[in-house]
Regions:
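A short beta-strand element within beta-rich, extracytoplasmic domains
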Residues: 100-114
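Exposed low-complexity, polar/acidic, P/S/T/G-rich flexible segments that act as propeptides
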Residues: 168-193
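Noncatalytic modules at the cell exterior or secretory-pathway interfaces
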Residues: 153-174
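Short beta-strands within extracellular/lumenal beta-sheet-rich domains
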Residues: 78-100
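C-terminal segment of N-terminal export signals and the immediately downstream linker at the start
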Residues: 30-57
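Short, surface-exposed beta-strand/strand-loop-strand elements in extracellular ectodomains
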Residues: 118-129
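N-terminal secretory signal peptides
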Residues: 1-14, 25-28, 37-38
Length: 193
C-alpha cells in the first residue's frame, strides 16, 4: 500500500494535487465562470509579481508626521494636519529572467486611511531615476484592498522599480492615519499593445 504523508508546510495547492481535488476544483471553477471571464483570465500573462511589505516604507518628510508605528502587519502613519508628503516603496525587481528582460505591467497598493481627510493624491512609478508612470489626482481614501495602476506602454525595466505615493492630510477634525500593508508590481514579457 502506497501511503502519502502530508508534512508541515505543505501548501493547499500541494494537498489538492495529492488528493486529486485540484482537477475537480479546476473543472468546477471553469464550469462556473462565464466565457468572458475565462477569456479575460486566459489573456492575463503575468510572468513575475514582486511585493514588499508596508513596514519597509520610507517617508520623505518625517517632520510632517505626527506619529509613526511599524508593526508586523503594516506601517501606521499619522500625518500632521494641513501637510503633504511622499511615501516610497523599493520593489524587489527582477530585470531579467531566463535571458529575457521583463516589462512593468501594473503596480498595486494595499492600504487604508482613517478618513476622507487623509488620502493618496498621486502614484508615480520609477525605473531607477526615470519616471515611467504618473497617476495624479487619484484621491483615494478609506479601504483600498488592492488599488491597481497601469504602467503605460509596458516599458522594459532596466534598473530597479520604485513606487512613490503622494499623500495629503487635511485640516478637518478627522482621523489622519494611514496604514500601508503592501506594495507590488506585476511584470510581464508581453509587448505593449
Amino acid at each position: 500500500m502506497n501511503e502519502q504523508t502530508i508534512v508541515a508546510g505543505t501548501s493547499r495547492r500541494e494537498m489538492l494535487k495529492r488528493s486529486g481535488m485540484g482537477v475537480v476544483a479546476g473543472a468546477a471553477v471553469g464550469a462556473l465562470a462565464t466565457p468572458s471571464v475565462q477569456a479575460a483570465a486566459a489573456d492575463i500573462k503575468i510572468s513575475y509579481a514582486s511585493w514588499i511589505h508596508g513596514h519597509s516604507m520610507q517617508i520623505e518628510y518625517p517632520d510632517r508626521i505626527a506619529s509613526m508605528r511599524r508593526a508586523g502587519f503594516s506601517i501606521d502613519v499619522e500625518g500632521k494636519p494641513g501637510t503633504t508628503n511622499w511615501f516610497h516603496f523599493a520593489i524587489p525587481t527582477p530585470v531579467i529572467i531566463d535571458d529575457v528582460r521583463l516589462r512593468a505591467d501594473k503596480v498595486l497598493l494595499r492600504f487604508t486611511t482613517g478618513s476622507v481627510d487623509a488620502f493618496v493624491r498621486h502614484v508615480h512609478v520609477y525605473d531607477g531615476e526615470k519616471l515611467i508612470a504618473e497617476h495624479n489626482n487619484v484621491n483615494l481614501s478609506k479601504e483600498n484592498p488592492l488599488a491597481g495602476f497601469v504602467v503605460p506602454d509596458r516599458p522594459l525595466i532596466l534598473l530597479g522599480l520604485g513606487i512613490s505615493i503622494g499623500v495629503a492630510f487635511g485640516v478637518e477634525m478627522m482621523d489622519h492615519h494611514m496604514d500601508f500593508i503592501a506594495a507590488g508590481c506585476d511584470f510581464t514579457l508581453r509587448n505593449p499593445l
